[in-house]
């Protein structure tokens, strides 16, 4: 079996305005579509940056996932974005009021990294 690439990553958010602002206005993704689905009580929109597509479901009644700092639950741990300069990203996060952890060094590859969080507390990572 051959997989060519990751097609998309699906995320569930609870608040349309906050989630859209975070991914589109703050992180710079382009919104490519939007579907209001009353029968499922949600809104689905896709955002894209380069080859990365995030499929975002807004479900106001979805239960919240366990909070950090304990990410050790079964399932997706976090989503990591490769960046050229983690420190510059952290400065931008401060300017944009994006909650993040401190700069640290990856134990395995020795590169700079840091975790940050979307409006619902989903752990995300930037990594050089």
Predicted features by range, described:
Residues 1-18, 76-81:
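N-terminal beta-strand motif that seeds the catalytic metal site of vicinal oxygen chelate
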Residues 32-34, 40-42, 62-67, 102:
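A short, acidic/glycine-rich surface segment
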């Amino acid at each position: 079996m051959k997989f060519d690439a990751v097609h998309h990553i699906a995320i569930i958010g609870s608040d349309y305005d906050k989630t859209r602002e975070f991914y589109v206005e703050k992180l710079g993704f382009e919104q490519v579509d939007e579907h209001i689905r009353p029968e499922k009580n949600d809104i689905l929109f896709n955002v894209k940056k380069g080859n990365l597509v995030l499929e975002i479901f807004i479900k106001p009644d979805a239960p919240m996932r366990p909070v950090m700092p304990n990410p050790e639950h079964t399932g997706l741990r976090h989503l990591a974005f490769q960046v050229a300069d983690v420190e510059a990203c952290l400065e931008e996060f401060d300017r944009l009021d994006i909650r993040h952890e401190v700069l640290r060094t990856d134990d395995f590859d020795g590169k700079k990294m840091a975790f940050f969080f979307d409006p619902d507390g989903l752990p995300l990572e930037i990594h050089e």
